[in-house]
Amino acid sequence: MRKITLAAAGALFVLSPHAFSAPYAADARSHGMGNTGVVSADYLTAPLHNPALGALYRENDDIGLLIPAVGVNIHDEDEALSAVDDAQDLYDSIQGIPTPANEAELNRLLDQLDKSVPVVINGGLSLAIAIPTRYMSVNLFSTGYVEILAAPDISDSTNTADRYLNSAVNLAAFGNVEYGIALSRAYTIGEQQFAFGITPKYQQLKTYTQRTTLDDFDIEDYDKSEVSKNTFNMDLGLAWYHNAFRAGLSLKDVFEQDIETKLGNYTYELTPQATVGIGYVGNYVALSLDADLTKQKRFKELDDDTQFIRVGIEGNAWGWAQLRAGYEIDLENNLDNSVTGGIGISPFDVISLDLAGSYAGDNQFGAAANLAFTF
């Protein structure tokens, strides 16, 4: 029998790089700080948040390697994945020795699925090599993510077996892999310090859709009906800084893209995403506030838009260990408000291991991890 536990589903999307990319940035430091990053990201993770930050580095920074950053978010508010798995097991047992109790329990599970909100899963992977210089900072990177939405469609048949067999799950997914180079440089303009960044990038966009019976549903089969599109895009970034104080603007995916699905006539819209940030990035503490100026559209036919306000804080113990916390709010109310936290370990300022998690209520959680080397 197919086991589709939350842990297995989460692992699938972290370990499937062929299906990755888009608005979700895999970065454990950012994740621990409420997914902020427009002014608080470092030169190594700048392409994930604001390419201008590649120019803001320390004098002893010569090269950085991010290998890799991974992350996953799962939103299964009504435990739909577990209910599907339980219903599949229970139906198999009913086929052998049906009992009124088993049929009643199967109906209860179907009722639970009928009332459940769609399951949403995001997963990401990022890699980067950064070489900062006073002439031009360069960051070669690859990043990607997949986001999946699964919604049960339960039959209204009065016969338990017929109701189960006639029920279905509708699944839609979007994936994108990006390969790019982030270029940035600092300037002094009118006695004020600025940094500008640009990221030309190549994108591989993919959509997946399917409608399958509840009995045959397996979330690992999300990529059975693939439509792909290759395209060019660009990110832009601006940062102002004075000592430890910063303000910034990031514009992701300057050129709007859309890609249709093979089934169901869905269209995924990858729209420009503008975010502003302000913060303080010091030696021992960092504070950041990011606010989306635009909505993230996603599937045109679905009410799945998001627009976030995020806050984060980091305490740094002499460059050897970090403690982080944050909070994010979706102004569109499609995702619940989330509390985040994380830790970092960076002995000798050469190896950095970052771990982070988020929580937004029962069955709504996320996790991320980074491994980086700086020389």
What residue spans do the PLM features occupy?
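Subset of outer-membrane beta-barrel
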Residues: 20-375
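Cleavable N-terminal export/targeting peptides
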Residues: 1-29
